[in-house]
């Protein structure tokens, strides 16, 4: 009886123990690219609040680079554009109006 369990664990018989085989987990994630570099945008217009709303969450906070995929250079430009749009009342500071 003990030999049949060992043979099953080694996979010599028809019975195969599944929890001994490694799981196939896909670890490759799609690489995020900066949409500004890809499309060749050099200037981010602060007068276009609909475009800037893509970089702001429901609470009105700026989304981080790791979520949007923008480069550091363009993340700074997005931040200044959002701040200018908020200052000129083109965008709300608080996200209550975003819903």
UniProtKB/Swiss-Prot annotation:
Pfam families named in the record: Ribosomal_S18
Signal sequence range: none
Cross-referenced SUPFAM superfamilies: Ribosomal protein S18
A cellular component annotation (GO) from this entry: cytosolic small ribosomal subunit
Molecular functions per Gene Ontology: small ribosomal subunit rRNA binding; structural constituent of ribosome
InterPro entries assigned to the protein according to its UniProt record, in alphabetical order: Ribosomal_bS18, Ribosomal_bS18_CS, Ribosomal_bS18_sf
Full protein name: Small ribosomal subunit protein bS18
Organism the protein comes from: Christiangramia forsetii (strain DSM 17595 / CGMCC 1.15422 / KT0803) (Gramella forsetii)
Gene: rpsR
């Amino acid at each position: 009886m003990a030999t049949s369990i060992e043979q099953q664990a080694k996979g010599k018989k028809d019975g195969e123990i599944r929890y001994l085989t490694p799981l196939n987990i896909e670890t490759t994630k799609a690489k995020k690219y900066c949409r500004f570099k890809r499309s060749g945008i050099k200037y981010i217009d602060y007068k276009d609040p609909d475009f800037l709303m893509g970089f702001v969450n429901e609470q009105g906070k700026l989304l981080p680079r790791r979520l949007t995929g923008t480069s550091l250079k363009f993340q700074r430009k997005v931040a200044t554009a959002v701040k200018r749009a908020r200052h000129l009342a083109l965008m709300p500071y608080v996200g209550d109006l975003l819903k």
